[in-house]
């Protein structure tokens, strides 16, 4: 049995929608460090249950070694438990990318639990499931791209339509200092948490819980090549036609400093479709 390292402080049964309205207030630009500490302490922690199939998928020798090495930053068991993944779920992952980090866990998990995993790269062309049938739509590190392309609202509407009533929109996203203009932060890969929350709420979702599972206080978001300066991408020199990049490459010492930060500071959010 897996030893559960995080204390259980809430029941796994998801709170009623009315309770979701008592979430802590959003941060402001003049928020002090003490206020930030209090606000984050009030966020809902994950509740861990023994899920043998999920543990087996995460611990599988079939997962690439490079993926496993990132578990220390991405906390797959805790994060998926926080989002409410259960055996037999129909999970739609949006734009999993070539590496498919979550895919390597979710696909075998679905197969082992008689669930369904669907990868969707172009949500506006189809969500790969019947309307109102998905238990979870998972979005990892994509809101900055959608904002730049002006597709956030249309994508969220597609997710809402695909989810069954009570279904979950699961979000992991590089997090900027809150209150900043997303037009400015998006090219760096980071997005304000309040922007993501308000966009999802405008699409009809209810914010049910936030977690600091994937927070990284070492990440000050001030990097010469955006979030891609950090692992796992580790961009170390200016990219062609990228106006936000520093014009000079990293020195060896700088490269080591950014590697020591680890992966980005990220918001981890759970939204629910009412019903």
PLM features: what roles do these ranges have?
Residues 54-82, 86-87:
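Class I SAM-dependent methyltransferase Rossmann-like catalytic core
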Residues 86-98:
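Conserved class I S-adenosyl-L-methionine
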Residues 127-137:
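A short acidic, Gly/Pro-enriched loop at the edge of an enzyme's catalytic core
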Residues 135-153:
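A short SAM/SAH-binding and catalytic strip from SAM-dependent methyltransferases
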Residues 152-165:
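A short glycine-rich, Lys/Arg-flanked "PGG" loop and its adjoining helix->strand segment in the class I
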Residues 166-174:
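Conserved beta-strand signature within the Rossmann-like core of class I S-adenosyl-L-methionine
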Residues 182-210:
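Conserved Class I S-adenosyl-L-methionine
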Residues 251-275:
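C-terminal lobe and adjacent flexible extensions of AdoMet/dcAdoMet transferase-like proteins
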